């Protein structure tokens, strides 16, 4: 019965994705993850991607809203206190929603997804979700301040570092490994303000992958080359900033979060 419910939950989540009903999609994937955990089996590639897409869309829209509102507040600060007050109220609502979704993802990954013995044995699966943990702690770090910022940044760093250690066994062109390097470098640049380390991670991943591009399988070619392009774009942007030539745009994370 659980298996039938699981398949039905995935079907519903897939339809919700097509209909862009991401709240429904997240709810359906929470059920699918719970059922998979009860049966002690890990999510297949389709299921883990559905889980990722559901929360990516819920969180990405809030991140965009938060940035837009903060930008608007900056323009009006010192000019119109009453409007700034309204903007602050709206920012608070968006932050609460964003943090709630992040905490939801982190709890699901820790409690259900990575707690299974099989999950620890599957290296790519393990790295995929450790990276995801790092990403969602990073999203929290974008909006929280003070001691909480330090705490979530520390958790993000630990998740990315653990994933990076495990990813050493994967080929340099593996898209999960490349996506991890991309997001870990963005974390160093945007959260830790360490441009040197960010560039080092991005350049190292790009250079290693370029050396083995000829061995890249057709299955992974599109994903891997896309992430390599994003690594190169970030390197160009970051080095230009260091030279004082460019201002503005943020570094690009992997395609799952754009």
Curated annotation (Swiss-Prot):
Signal peptide: none annotated. It holds the Pfam family 14-3-3. SUPFAM superfamilies: 14-3-3 protein (SSF48445). Belongs to the 14-3-3 family. This is 14-3-3 protein homolog. It comes from Encephalitozoon cuniculi (strain GB-M1).
